[in-house]
């Protein structure tokens, strides 16, 4: 015990030290802030009290305390009742005992079951006379085995009873079905006071004939026929007998009980008015939608609501969309719920211009705000705003995607198109269709479609099984079936797209058993003095075989090649680094002289490969050139400017001066691609990997001119064993004619600088005539050894037949091979990828896609057996033909409002180093931009292209309402969908799907032989009587965009947008509809309540007057004829709502009118659906297909094909090659170059360009990758595979590239 105080003192010492430190710290805080700790605490408490979240939590806490007190009082009240009841029972028992004692009886506690009689088995045999036979089975214990006869009799009686019961059930069922109609007419068989959780006199909501819901009281539950009806007395007078799906609970359901597809009643706010409408839950609360529910109302509107604005439907239907009256909305909801969470939506951001449909017309509009899945669109014509669901086909990108897929389906059914994914996906700068995913799960999540039950949570429906295709023993049928099982990537490019360097996961790379002794084609690469030919097969090292995989025949042994550097498998601090560049300190002075060969005599290299493997942009500095960056002010804006100073002291400020200097001095060791005037491209910025687990200096083993290093910073996994080949290898059945007689050569002596005299340059220039406008671009091709944008018609480089110097020629780039320094690296979750080790300037050549060239049939077969991850289509012919027919438009113009981003057009030099990295807000990165959700009087819509109209249109169409209106189209406030056809076209049946409707609409709008096609072949339509087209030519927005940027621009960003001939663009006649409302707006019945539109009705009434008074450059009326009119060749007369046809002639607004033939539609439905491929293949076209100027519907012969009529078919260019019908495939799975490792990105930094080098055969271009923007060192290089989502049956590939423009899905 004596040592206890010492222990206590030792324990108290640290505490005292801590208290002293705390005191010192408090004293320091007081001295620094000038306030005491108590004042600081008080200040912090006051600030916390002011915070909204604290006040909200306190309010919630107070409510919780109130609720707890209320519950405690209720519990106490129940306890008191229980105690009182117990006391009363005790008193009652005492009274009973007293009574028994008075009677002289003895009272004892017993159970009622103990005194019950033995059970009696009753067998009822109903007959026609309703006689009941009761047989006492007797005591079970008294039965003996001797009673065999009695048992047999009982069994016979039971069997007879069952037979008679079945017979009576059949008779009763037949009689009840005959009397069912009488029961449904009002013969009430009984009234109930309770039905589940529905009790008479409870508060509920009911639906009135006006389609709005109102509060009331349940006064009766009646059994009518086989169902139940609920009689509701509304608070605002009136009674109604409603079904269970037309009443709702008067409480707000918890969030966990609601799912996508739940049937609810929600509040719709229109200004100061609030209405209750029925709808379905389209989104559950999450962070992106500010914890709100997205509701799709039955009449086509969409809106975000909170939980306190929802009421659950009492007895919803099993398929909730069947309760929607409007057919177009019903089809949309069914497709939406079935496909959820795969929701295609247009990716938008504020300020973008886009075409939006309204009343059957495409109007020029602008994105004002993006709120989750909704976007507020401002119509520039009348400044009207409207909220639209981003997945609605009223937005031009969504409509273009639907129509293109429907058109492809028609061609497949008609045998005009081979069953293959559409390699020209709708990709354009600006709005793109994005497939959102529920990334919280691991796979496809199908939402439950069971109706919301108030007692138990809904059970999800099982996934509908896919019907297997019947196996066919015929060889051709098996081959045809195998063709649809391979996926092929597409190389469609969106010019000028800006995105991140991340990529999506590619298919897993596997090690294969590769024969290393395959022969290749010799390729010439650049040498300063002579052309040196290398044979890849001679340097191919033996590849170790891998046990798994199909057996392959042994190849010839490869001769010994150069030994590869050893791989570092251990953990290193960093990869081997090279010394940094140090600029020389001495200054260069210029003395006036004439530059010649002697200016570079002192720096000419003794060895040809002195700086091989260095950054090509750094090589001029290593040869004593100086690269200086200066600042200068242009138009009150400070910009950067790059100047090169030569060894002789001459300053070079432009690429033209650099090119002239190189030719004047005869410089054959420095080339134009080694110079860059972009101030944001740094030539001495190197990327250094950190602590690799695995490192290889060169995986090409010397086959490439520049070493390709490999590093793994994730684990010790080595790269896949692939036979590296930097050139393409013809496969079985493939012959490439590389003879000089199949080439066109030039005789240039000036390095092919004069494009007008170079035959190879002229091939590139003349090929640009295959554009929609047919105009020749004299500036096409390489500009100072760089390609600023994709050239769809291809680039023709100088070849071995040319007499120009291979080293000095400005038209030789791709054939020189890899020049930039790249690295193969292991990504976190995307397999292996390629990144650059130095900055890459915009337009620079990066690499090619090399591999084995296969025929289409062999590629399909091989893709099923070994995989299709590295397939690429050589479809240059098809891409150019489609481009010529007017399907594509890469260039943003003032009329092509879909996809024009006004912010992107303002491109100039700013003071930041990487201006492209500051991305604008979009619907992905900033889903909820504004905190205050606007509930102003603007319309919201989600579904198909709906036509809403104003009071004036109803007045104009009042005279023809009885004749032109289809039956049962709903109340006047419900817009008529475009899928409902009028005026000679039968309305589609209720069984039609949305895809079939679009396909029927396309085929129904085919133009007859008397139709007119514009010079660009963008669309075909009929000439209206007296409708002459006028030339517009207004380019105000394009001019403003071109002058809004900085006056001084970098060379890499100096891109002039192409312009089409305004005369050709505006040679479009105007077509209007006669005796009908324009855009399928038939007058409606006057029944029902019109949804209040406040000031919108006035704007709608002004639409007709405004559209006729608009500028000729603002409106283009385009109307497709129906099949009956297409055959007769007649045109429609102008309607009353549109005056002169010439007053509405433009590209900015296009009117579309849909119609379909019912019989033709049924025939298409009976056809077997098109079989989809199961092979994904990249396409080597360097651009994307998109719908030009709105819808750009191409007239097809599908209508005549369906009717058995003969229609002329234009011969495809590929058929001139011995009748070939399909393109060739490049497969880089077993043999290939670094291009096989390039991953996908929805916002890539590379684009694909077809280049003709060793042959001018249009079937075999080289597939080259160019930088679409400046790329910072260490950035992963990516390109857009352009898969068409849903094109490969049974395959789904999510995209997680991380780009703002990410489309969500690849397949």
From Swiss-Prot:
- Domain Pre-SET, by residue range, is 744-817
This protein is called: Histone-lysine N-methyltransferase SETDB1
Phosphoserine occurs at 112, 117, 1042
Q: Which organism is it from?
A: Mus musculus
The location annotated for the cross-link Glycyl lysine isopeptide (Lys-Gly) (interchain with G-Cter in SUMO2) is 182, 1049, 1055, 1085, 1165
| Gene3D superfamilies documented for this protein | 2.30.30.140, SET domain
Q: What is the lineage of its organism?
A: Eukaryota, Metazoa, Chordata, Craniata, Vertebrata
Q: In which tissues is it expressed?
A: Ubiquitously expressed. Strong expression in liver and testis. Expressed in the brain, lungs, kidneys, uterus and seminal vesicles.
Q: Where is the composition biased (Low complexity)?
A: 495-512, 1116-1131
Specify the SET domain's residue ranges: 820-1282
The MBD domain covers 611-682
Q: Where in the cell is it found?
A: Nucleus; Chromosome
